[in-house]
């Protein structure tokens, strides 16, 4: 048993890898704050009002240094918080230790098993003193899914009887165990939730699907589609963190290689830019004719995965879809081709189909898959997020954009929840512009101010918003 789990049995309301890392984590948190002006200024603006006083936030989001600054912003504004990571490999152990030492219950360490992951996802809803979480801050939708699926299983256990992958095996087992102990565990907690703010594309897809089917049990704010999130975190964050992960894992020379990026949304665009910037020849696969045309107009060759599989050196999935790289693709790849994913879930690459072959672990989150003919394919982070599994994720500055949106969304939903139906919303344009404005001074950017005549000429307030909601940045 991991030492961190043993700690949790000694009446300590946290599970981390090593509390001796806390001081190191605190030093990095202090550095990160200097690069996260949006969060720091939001603390200053709202700390006297304490708008989150009474909020009990169940957080499921990568437990990194940057997330630590988010957590301490939420608590500075009055919230009580319990936190787990949304990925088994993404935790930075020194960050988790620092936040736990400061008094926030954290249940996360790098390299969790799937059983531990789902146990920790339950722990964020286990509030002391008979209280319950009333807000969810989610990344990928697992915390939201847990309560909704568990509540459904209370009425019909058959919904957790037929797992289709190892993730579902662990999830269903965990739900069944909790139902055996308390048959109303999930519905009791679900009834207290006022709303969720969702960080990423995959989780947002889940929310919109539930809304469409009339199954969304509480209001949701789609943080991902704030312009200052999707056009910054997804694009510029991935532009820096993808190659950081690949190079830390493999030390490969990117220049001269053929790299395939599956998906040319905001994440794929950032990935393609970074690989081309280091001298790779970049090919793109796409299902959407608009995105495919964008890629072609940027000078990328648009191909199919079937065409590229036996020709390219590096493969990156960035689609949010299922089995974008399948078994036959990997079987066709060159010896020592590098395969990785930067979408939220590990299902973009059909990793399960390769378990029949020999795996040779090179170092943490770097494996050789050895095919029967002796060919090896290098798989990074077991098909999970390469930038967080093999590196430390996005830089602090760009995460300040995303997490300032999260903070404002939590404030809005907690303080104004009665205004919202059980639907998915996005933050209003004036808040999107506010988030951007908070970050300009840090990078030496100075805004031009419209004159009254100029503002009148184009029909906007001189202080914004400057664009209509349908504007595409």
Swiss-Prot record:
Biological function: May play a key role in the regulation of the intracellular concentration of adenosylhomocysteine.
One Gene Ontology biological process: L-homocysteine biosynthetic process
Protein residues bound to substrate: 64, 139, 199, 229, 233
Superkingdom assignment: Bacteria
UniProt xrefs under NCBIfam families: ahcY (TIGR00936), PRK05476.2-3 (NF004005)
Gene3D superfamilies named in the record: Adenosylhomocysteinase-like (3.40.50.1480), NAD(P)-binding Rossmann-like Domain (3.40.50.720)
UniProt xrefs under SUPFAM superfamilies: Formate/glycerate dehydrogenase catalytic domain-like (SSF52283), NAD(P)-binding Rossmann-fold domains (SSF51735)
Name of the featured protein: Adenosylhomocysteinase
Keyword tags: Cytoplasm, Hydrolase, NAD, One-carbon metabolism
EC numbers on record: 3.13.2.1
Disulfide bonds: none
Gene that encodes the chain: ahcY
Family designation: Belongs to the adenosylhomocysteinase family.
Pathway: Amino-acid biosynthesis; L-homocysteine biosynthesis; L-homocysteine from S-adenosyl-L-homocysteine: step 1/1
A Pfam family reported for this protein in Swiss-Prot or TrEMBL: AdoHcyase
HAMAP family xref list: AdoHcyase
Positions contributing to NAD(+) binding: 200-202, 234, 263-268, 286, 321, 342-344, 387
Annotated cofactor note: Binds 1 NAD(+) per subunit.
Catalytic activity: S-adenosyl-L-homocysteine + H2O = L-homocysteine + adenosine
UniProt GO molecular function: adenosylhomocysteinase activity
Main location (coarse class): cytoplasm
Subcellular location, record wording: Cytoplasm
Cofactors named for this entry: NAD(+)
Entry's transmembrane regions: none
GO cellular component: cytosol
InterPro entries attached to this UniProt entry: Adenosylhomocyst_ase-like_sf (IPR042172), Adenosylhomocysteinase-like (IPR000043), Ado_hCys_hydrolase_NAD-bd (IPR015878), NAD(P)-bd_dom_sf (IPR036291), S-Ado-L-homoCys_hydrolase_CS (IPR020082)
Annotated source species: Paraburkholderia phytofirmans (strain DSM 17436 / LMG 22146 / PsJN)
PANTHER family for the chain: ADENOSYLHOMOCYSTEINASE (PTHR23420:SF0)
